[in-house]
């Protein structure tokens, strides 16, 4: 019919055109087909802002330029370099993954999303990103940003906390992929960029969106209603008591550190001794110890708000505390929880 408007180009075509003109192009892990760098960036970017990741990524690449160097490193080296980035299970899996790439695949990352998922710490979306960016595989990423873009565009109001609904969304994501596998790197980056810069959780900029013309959520006037996920972890609060025990003389001071259990808060990290009560901390000290209480610290974990009370004591280097651990002067080179590293740095200043 004369004068009828043409249907919009495919979702993929519009996204590709937008990404090439308006997407992000200057990030340090872009412009490479090296799966080591892509994998490292994808793991770091989980639950962490781009601005925070850039410095850590640069330091990791400088220290461990390839997967062989990372695999050969000690756990303490890896955890120390990761310290402050949070979600420390990522660092443990990162190290284990590097070693498995060396042992199982001869130092070469597998070239398919299916095989990539057999490695520690690589889930379906991370595997899809590596396979798409490095090997042009038509694999669909489905991280938080992408779920938001797709559920809004498709008007998918199903509860993504239900596994069957998440699988159905993945199938719809596969149907939207570009036909040409060579377009997969730009398409995948475009989805990430759109979710991060335009289709944001709050106040999305629909006027800048390349796929707004047929976006269901925009037509409904309620984009912030998507995605739907009813099962959410509730935040909790916890108070902990830390022991900052240092040897004399202060100028060459060592501190008493323990190794945290494999599970729980700060799992596997070196740490100041942690107690559940003030009295339990005091009971671990020699009767002659003079305690100075530092100002309490607030520290937020993923779904827990911590209040940290720190007791500072000075003891002879020959002292042995009735708790696990040892005197360490090399704490700057160890993987420590961020609030404890800050405490030690402040006491050394």
Regions found by a protein language model. Name each.
Residues 7, 13-207, 211-220, 224, ...:
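Catalytic cores of DNA base-excision repair glycosylases
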Residues 1-25, 31, 193-349:
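Intrinsically disordered, low-complexity, charged terminal extensions of DNA damage-control enzymes
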């Amino acid at each position: 019919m004369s004068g009828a408007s043409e249907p919009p180009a495919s979702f993929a075509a519009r996204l590709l055109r937008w990404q090439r003109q308006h997407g992000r192009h200057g990030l340090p892990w872009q412009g490479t087909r090296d799966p080591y760098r892509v994998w490292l960036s994808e793991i770091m970017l989980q639950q962490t802002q781009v601005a925070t990741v850039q410095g850590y990524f640069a330091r990791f690449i400088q220290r461990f330029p390839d997967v062989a160097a990372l695999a050969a490193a000690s756990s303490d080296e890896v955890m120390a370099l990761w310290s402050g980035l949070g979600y420390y299970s990522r660092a443990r899996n990162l190290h284990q993954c590097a070693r498995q790439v060396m042992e199982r695949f001869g130092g070469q990352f597998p070239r398919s999303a299916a095989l990539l998922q057999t490695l520690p710490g690589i889930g379906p979306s991370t595997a899809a990103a590596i396979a798409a960016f490095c090997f042009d595989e038509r694999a669909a990423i489905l991280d938080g940003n992408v779920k938001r873009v797709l559920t809004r565009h498709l008007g998918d109001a199903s509860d993504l906390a239900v596994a069957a609904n998440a699988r159905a969304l993945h199938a719809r994501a596969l149907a939207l992929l570009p036909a040409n596998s060579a377009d997969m790197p730009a398409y995948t980056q475009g989805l990430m960029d759109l979710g991060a810069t335009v289709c944001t959780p709050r106040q999305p900029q629909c006027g800048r969106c390349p796929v707004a013309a047929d976006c269901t959520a925009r037509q409904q006037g309620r984009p912030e209603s998507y995605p739907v996920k009813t099962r959410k972890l509730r935040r909790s609060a916890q108070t902990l008591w830390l022991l900052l025990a240092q040897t004399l003389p202060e100028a060459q001071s060592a501190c008493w550190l323990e190794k945290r259990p494999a599970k729980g808060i700060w799992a596997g990290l070196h740490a100041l001794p942690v107690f559940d009560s003030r009295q339990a901390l005091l009971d671990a000290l020699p009767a002659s110890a003079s305690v100075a209480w530092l100002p309490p610290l607030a520290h937020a974990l993923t779904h827990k708000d911590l209040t940290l009370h720190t007791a500072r004591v000075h003891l002879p280097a020959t002292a042995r505390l009735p708790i696990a651990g040892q005197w360490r002067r090399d704490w700057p080179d160890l993987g420590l929880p961020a609030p404890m590293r800050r405490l030690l740095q402040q006491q050394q200043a």
